[in-house]
Amino acid sequence: MTTQMTTLANGLRVISESRDGVQTTAVGVWVDAGARYESIANNGVAHMLEHMAFKGTDSRSARDIAVEIESVGGHLNAYTSREHTAYFVRVLKEDLALSVDILADILQRSTFEEAEMARERAVVIQEIGQSEDTPDDIIFDRLQEVSFPNQALGRSILGPAEGVAAMGREVLFDFMAEHYTASRLLLCAAGAVDHDALVAMAEAKFGNLRPGAHHPFEAAVFKGGESREERELEQVHFALALPALPYDDDDFYPMQVMSTVLGGGMSSRLFQEVREKRGLCYSIFCFATSYKECGAFTIYAGTGADQVGELVPVICNEMLRLSGDAAQDEVNRARAQLKAGTLMSLESSASRAEQLARQTLVFGRQIPVEELIERIDAVDMAAVRRVAGRISSGGEPAVA
């Protein structure tokens, strides 16, 4: 594998990783802007842009976009997160130029016709309704709200239904003009790709995109709190979040290992103690989410109403115990899981393109796989205990 990056004159970064023995290419544009860059007034616009990107440009209708990609057997998709937005395609290697052309078209010449806007507003409102009927979605949205109350990072990615219903096309144009600038976009491809050819495509299709200043985001502070909601359900859905670490913290990798020890699989402490030993739940897991300046460490479980009083103390006790008695065999097992996951992801060009893009947006560079493995291997028992202590005593928790 050969990984390369070139920065165009306007600031747009072009990244590629050429892989031997493959016939396909995954290519996408990642934008350093997501839901946390919204205001209360335009909450939901980043997600609406993701929906509207495929609904027509100056030269292509929504049907044209779908037909062109699917006529060559390609797959087109997008997603919105709190910090980033991505638009990506997977195609046969000979169709890379078509993919870049379509990506450039939808990101620079989308028309956001009112008829399409009206239909897509209705679709997103249905998506919001479906989310509100899905306990897993509700619990994590409410947890985010109480973790970061009255802050952009705490607001829903989908936005409120009433805000979406009133959102006009000018809101989308304004958000794109402010945030979709060359210095905040990167074009990334992995698979059967020639870097020089990709750079030439980027120059031709994105070279006139204006550089633009980097828009500062509202710094977030984890504050904690509680959200309770009664519904007619079979289970109590419980989630606990604690202040955690940003991407650039020295304990970022120890936190990933610690999370795996605590709730990262069937051998994890939470799974063994809560499910296997006590039978208190079917689903229990934890994960660490890092942002640019902060983070959240989350534990989730679903249980019966009669069991929640026993479940919560057990979860809290397991979290607290980890800072004092994390064992070397647990650390070894967690490191092996993380290393295996890292190496297995290399087998997918789409996963690899995603990794390279995210690393560049977050760290400003592509991290060699060998370095990732070294950093995981460097995490020892003392580091896991230390980071468990940092997180468990880091501040007021959030509960939903």
Could you say what each language-model-derived stretch is?
Residues 1-24:
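N- or domain-start disorder-to-order transition segments that initiate the globular core
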Residues 7, 15-18, 62-217, 228, ...:
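Charge-rich, well-structured scaffold segments of protease-associated domains
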Residues 21, 26-90, 264-280:
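M16/MPP (pitrilysin/insulinase) zinc-metallopeptidase core fold and M16-derived inactive scaffolds
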Residues 40-44, 98, 119, 250-253, ...:
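A generic structural signal for residues located within well-ordered alpha-helices
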Residues 247, 253-266, 270:
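A conserved active-site cap/scaffold subdomain adjacent to cofactor or substrate pockets
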